[in-house]
């Protein structure tokens, strides 16, 4: 009985058809697209340590026979010792395990608490589905949090601009009152700008020190 292989393929943005858009309920893909757009990278020490440990780990994958022969010939031509071919997975087992197993095919006995391989695969699929659901929930919370932060930033900017407009309006009223009281005062020279600029409080004295918005 051969062990079934599970292949999980994820469609990237490049492989996605041109007319197909990201589903509205797929928050994980939206978060990934936003991360790539903003060029965000995690800098958590735990993640960096895990990534470094994963890169340093060597995986004894079996190589084709042609590649093994090429490596042996390269070692012989170089004058050094020939490279040892990679061992088969059964050679990596302890002597007791390899002697007990022999050449018997893989049976459907108990596998780490499971009655059969199908039961283990069903449990694995269930765990992956639950992890996928948790990822979607976290991605939805992060996207909602980002929207709330942007909304608060816009509201704060509007409040600041509204306050500056109110200050400019009060200053304009004070200058109008002073200009009525002192007609010959040099303050009247500050109103030499155009009428629309004077209505919003932009004068020669504060044109370089204030910033205004349409909020």
Curated annotation (Swiss-Prot):
Source organism of the structure: Mus musculus
Family: Belongs to the FAM167 (SEC) family.
Keyword Secreted on entry: no
Residue ranges of the region described as Disordered: 1-26, 63-109
Coiled coil residues, start to end: 124-157
Protein name as annotated: Protein FAM167A
Keywords: Coiled coil
């Amino acid at each position: 009985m051969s062990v079934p292989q599970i292949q999980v393929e994820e469609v990237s943005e490049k492989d996605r058809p041109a007319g197909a858009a990201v589903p509205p309920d797929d928050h994980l893909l939206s978060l990934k697209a936003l991360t790539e757009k903003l060029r965000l990278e995690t800098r958590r020490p735990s993640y960096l340590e895990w990534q470094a440990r994963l890169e340093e780990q060597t995986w004894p994958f079996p190589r084709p026979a042609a590649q093994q022969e090429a490596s042996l010939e390269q070692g012989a031509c170089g004058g050094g010792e020939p490279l040892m071919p990679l061992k088969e997975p059964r050679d990596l087992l302890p002597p007791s395990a390899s002697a007990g197993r022999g050449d018997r095919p893989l049976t459907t006995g108990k596998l780490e608490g499971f009655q059969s391989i199908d039961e283990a695969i069903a449990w694995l699929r269930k765990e992956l589905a639950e992890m996928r659901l948790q990822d979607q929930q976290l991605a939805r919370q992060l996207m909602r949090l980002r929207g709330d932060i942007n909304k608060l930033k816009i509201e704060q900017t509007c409040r600041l601009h509204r306050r500056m407009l109110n200050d400019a309006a009060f200053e304009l009223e004070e200058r109008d009152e002073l200009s009525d009281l002192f007609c010959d005062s040099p303050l009247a020279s500050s109103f030499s700008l155009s009428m629309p600029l004077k209505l919003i409080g932009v004068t020669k004295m504060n044109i370089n020190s204030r910033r205004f918005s349409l909020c």
